[in-house]
Every structure is written in structure tokens, then in C-alpha cells.
Amino acid sequence: HKIFYTGDINLSSQTLQPSAHLPEIKIDTLILESTYGATDSDLLLDWNSESLRFAKEANNILNNGGSILIPVFSLGKMQEILATIWLLMQKRKLTTVDIYTGGLGTKINRAYDYNRFTVRRVDEEFELSSIPQKDYYEISNPEEFFKHPCIVLASSGMMITSTSSFTFAKRWLKQKDSAIFTVGYMAEDTPGYVIANSERGDKIQLTSFDEPTEVNCAIKNFKFSAHARREDLVKIVDKLKPDNVILTHGDEEAFDWMGSSILKKYKNIKVQTAAIEKEIKIL
């Protein structure tokens, strides 16, 4: 009995990571992520189009003397966004400014470079270490970030309490010429979600322990996703034609869309949804 578990999967290439290759063998059970099962694909730009939208918004901030904070996950999103920013600068699509990185993300950058010939890459010759970067841990006074325009990539991606991005965000929120750009998913119970769903002039409270603060900076949200669109998820079923599909990593609405779409095309496929502590029988 052969099981294929997609994990987070994307059939489109990012800056570093190429599109996923699917197995050529017969699959009996497919465990399929459903992250964007409830999202209209017309709302999702491809990576290149979203990069150009990012560059346009970033130039508006940088060319007016502001700095940009981008909260990122240390693994994956940090490397993809860093490479995207650098290539936009090289193509003169994005104003060239200092890029600050630090912490675990920079260590993972080295792992990416070291293993670039042993895993699939869009360009295996490209090294993240070739990108000029400054270490934000070497900045003793955060006000240094606002003396000259710059871009800061800091974890955690959801601006969790006590992380670098959370600490920096408190400073950024006070800066009328600067901006916080979100580039990925924010869980509802995180400071990142509060910030991503606010706009200039709002009063927000990041945690129950923090005083309400006014949003003075710009807030811009981008979808640089490592997840496939829902139509592409169905295409995975089309290609593999499994006997069983187990839907994971999605909410009820996502499961409903995915399940009904699969069953409309394939009456003989058994579709189930995963849940914590739920036992699923496949044999």
C-alpha cells in the first residue's frame, strides 16, 4: 500500500524553490494539504506578479526616506524573500538599500548554500551568502534603522512575543514614513494577525500585556505562498488517481470545497478529512 503525503506543496516555482515533482508510481492513499481550498485563486497572484507589486509598494516607502520591516519564518520564507528582494534590486525594479538579517535565519541561509547542489533549485549556482547583508544584532540602538532607508527581515513570521520581529514592530508602528510588510500567513491569536489587519490611524493592542498603541506606519500585506492553489491541488488528484484521499491542513470551508470538487470528478475515490485524535482507516 503506497502512501504519498504532500506536506506543503506548490506546483509553481518560487525564487529559489522549483515547482514540485509528483511521483510516477501508482498511489493508493494521498494525504493532501488543503490550505487554499477556500480561497478564490483569482485573489492569488503568481510569485513574479506579487514580486512586482511588492517592489512598487516598497519603492514608495524607500524613496520617501522610510524603512521596511518584513517579519519572516526563519526557514523557507526568509530565504525566498531575501533572494526575491536581491534579484529585484539587481533588475533595478527595487531601490537598492541596506538589507538587515540575523539570528537563526542567517544560519539556515548557510545550510541552503551548502546543500544547493544536492536538492532541486531554480538556480543551483545562486548563493544567499553573495547577497550583501548587515546583522541586525549588531545594532545597539533600533533608531539606527530609521536614519537611512533600509529593509529588515526578522523572525518570527507571526511577530510572536519576545522575538526580534515583535520587538522591531513596536518601533516601526511609531514611524509615519516607514512600513511593515507581511508576506505570509498570520494565525488569528498572534500579534502579526493584529498588525496585518490594521491600518494607519488604528489603535491596536498586540498582546493582553501591552498598552494600546496607534498605528503610524503603513501596513501592506502580500501573499508569497508556498502552498498550491486549490485547482492545482485537484490536479494532483487527477495525476495520481489514488483510491483514498485524506485532506489535511485546512479549515472546514477548505475541506468542503476540496472534497466536493474531488467527488464530482471521481465517484470511486474515498475522501476523508484529518483532525486531531481522529482515527482514519484506509485499508
Enumerate the language-model features and the residues they cover.
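His/Asp/Glu-rich metal-coordinating catalytic cores
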Residues: 1-80, 84-93, 98
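Core dinuclear metal-dependent hydrolase active-site scaffold
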Residues: 1-19, 143-145, 151, 157, ...
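Active-site neighborhood of phospho(di)ester-bond hydrolases with catalytic His/Asp-centered motifs
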Residues: 4-9, 31-35, 70-73, 101-103, ...
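Hard-cation-handling environments
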Residues: 54-191, 248
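Proline-aspartate-enriched helix->loop->beta-strand connector
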Residues: 237, 241-247
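Short acidic, glycine/proline-enriched helix-loop-strand junctions
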Residues: 256-280
